[in-house]
A protein has these predicted regions:
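Pocket-lining segment of extracytoplasmic ligand-binding domains
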Residues: 92, 171-263
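Bacterial N-terminal signal peptides
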Residues: 8-17
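Bacterial signal peptide processing site
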Residues: 18-24
Length: 329
């Protein structure tokens, strides 16, 4: 009995030691982490899913879980409360979160140029932004829509107050197809592609071709307190984007394999549009890359302050959130 008791005590001691720290994880084992997306998975996220499929995040020390958001407001909240480690955010949402006082840092770019546009039906009638004067234009109700629309209108010498804005939510495809509006703010890589696939003639006015600078539409953000974890995520992303460059169709296949319910034809068309626009390639050229140049973030900030999306008094606070790729500062 005494021997049995001693063995049981020793076993309990070993179990207690093993249970202390790291939740029982073995030394050197990948650390669990969560990346929240900006929207439901789609072709724009192909580099992320390629890295996940190839084990690049695990090799970098992360057991990464990719999480879909329940709303576009999720990302900042989850980072703020510590319920997510990383988040893909629209750069406009990132800037507004910084303005609100959240200490987030942008460490990578998922795409390297704006995806926002004004899409018009009846391209025979609407050839330039000047032709939008007096038209009914749909907006989602998101603040950045007004900044995008005003920029495109002003590029054609149109007074923004001369158009009739209609809040249509995220129904641009249906409302443009039905002729409910003459034009709408929408993403050219998503709604623009779907309209073309439906055979509806449209004209796109991409915001960086009509008055806005080139800036990264989507960034990866981290709470500054978690900056030490950024390097591992970036290592995985770089390899994922290298795979995307080497074989885009295989990267898209990784997305489709991991996310059920996506339409292959739609996603192939979206990826083709992104590649044609070199949306994954930094402004200085080269191959697809998640590298985020701080000056690209500042280019967005200059435009956003001019259009009233964020206050000029918040510019310094927001600018401090655009850290160089590879680390936080």
């Amino acid at each position: 009995m005494r021997r049995v008791a001693a063995l049981l005590a020793a076993a309990a001691l070993v179990a207690g030691i093993a249970g202390c720290g790291g939740g029982g994880a073995e030394p050197g084992a990948p650390r669990g982490a969560t990346l929240v997306l900006d929207f439901q998975p789609n072709a724009v996220h192909s580099g992320i899913y390629a890295a996940q499929a190839n084990g690049d995040f695990r090799d970098a020390g992360l057991n990464l879980r990719i999480q879909e958001p329940s709303s576009t407001a999720d990302s900042a909240k989850l980072l703020e409360t510590g319920r997510a480690d990383f988040a893909v955010m629209d750069v406009n949402d990132f800037g507004i979160a910084r303005e609100r006082g959240l200490d987030l840092v942008a460490i990578a770019a998922i795409v390297q140029r704006p995806l926002a546009s004004v899409i018009a039906r009846n391209p025979g009638e609407i050839r330039t932004p000047a032709d939008l004067a007096g038209k009914n234009i749909g907006v989602t109700g998101v603040p950045s829509d007004d900044a995008v629309l005003d920029t495109v209108l002003r590029s054609g010498g149109v007074d923004p107050s001369s158009v009739h804005r209609v809040t249509i939510g995220f129904n641009a495809v249906a409302d443009l197809a039905a002729g409910q509006v003459d034009a709408a703010t929408a993403f050219w890589n998503a709604e623009g592609v779907e309209l073309q696939r439906k055979g509806i003639p449209v004209r796109e006015f991409r915001v960086d071709q009509f008055g806005a600078p080139r800036y990264p539409e989507l960034v990866v953000a981290v709470a500054r307190r978690n900056c030490s974890e950024a390097g591992a995520l970036l290592d995985g992303l770089r390899k994922g984007y290298a795979a995307l460059t080497l074989d885009p169709r295989a990267a898209l296949g990784d997305l489709l394999d991991q996310v059920t319910g996506l339409d292959r034809g739609s996603q192939e068309a979206q990826l083709a549009a992104l590649e044609s626009a070199r949306a994954f390639v930094p402004a200085d050229g080269g191959a697809a890359s998640p590298a985020l140049a701080p000056e690209d973030g500042r280019a967005w900030l200059g435009w956003a302050t001019r259009r009233g999306l964020v206050k000029r008094s918040s510019a310094a606070r927001i600018a401090a959130g655009f850290g160089a790729s590879g680390g936080c500062r």
